[in-house]
């Protein structure tokens, strides 16, 4: 699963999910993509589950790019612990995703295979997503 090798600080504030994604909202590497339509935290486990679903369906055909990285630590307190005595220890990592963000990109496969693979990965995500593709430029005659 994805997580940073090292961070400057162990713990972070929760923050807010305001607005739409201004970066990472266009297809850069592949021909097909899965785009987020809602704001959410996506855990490293969910990212990995989506990656496995896509690669399993495509049978190692084509290439896959993961466009999000979980760089935010989420802390948790032990069960049945009294209030106070500081913030809990980091338990897992999440990627902060705003609407419009590209989650996965794919190329080297047909559109039907890419659409089906992305649909399976979309079921693993906690948010609504949409399948997008880059417009193919007409050949110059």
UniProtKB/Swiss-Prot annotation:
Any one GO molecular function term: rRNA binding
Alphabetical list of HAMAP family matching this protein: Ribosomal_uL16
Species: Zygnema circumcarinatum
Keyword Ribosomal protein in record: yes
Protein's name in the database: Large ribosomal subunit protein uL16c
NCBIfam families xref list: rplP_bact
Assembly mode: Part of the 50S ribosomal subunit.
GO biological process, one term: mitochondrial translation
């Amino acid at each position: 699963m994805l997580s940073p090798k090292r961070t400057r600080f162990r713990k972070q504030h929760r923050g807010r999910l305001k607005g739409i994604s201004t970066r990472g909202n266009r297809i850069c590497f592949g021909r097909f993509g899965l785009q987020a339509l809602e704001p959410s935290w996506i855990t490293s486990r969910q990212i990995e589950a989506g990656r496995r679903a896509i690669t399993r369906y495509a049978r190692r055909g084509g290439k896959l790019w993961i466009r999000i990285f979980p760089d935010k630590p989420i802390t948790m307190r032990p069960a049945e612990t009294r209030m106070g005595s500081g913030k809990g220890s980091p338990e897992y990592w999440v990627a902060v995703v705003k609407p419009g963000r590209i989650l996965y990109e794919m190329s080297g496969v047909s559109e039907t295979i890419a659409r089906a693979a992305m649909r399976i990965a979309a079921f693993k995500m906690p948010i609504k997503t949409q399948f997008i593709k880059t417009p193919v430029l007409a050949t110059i005659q």
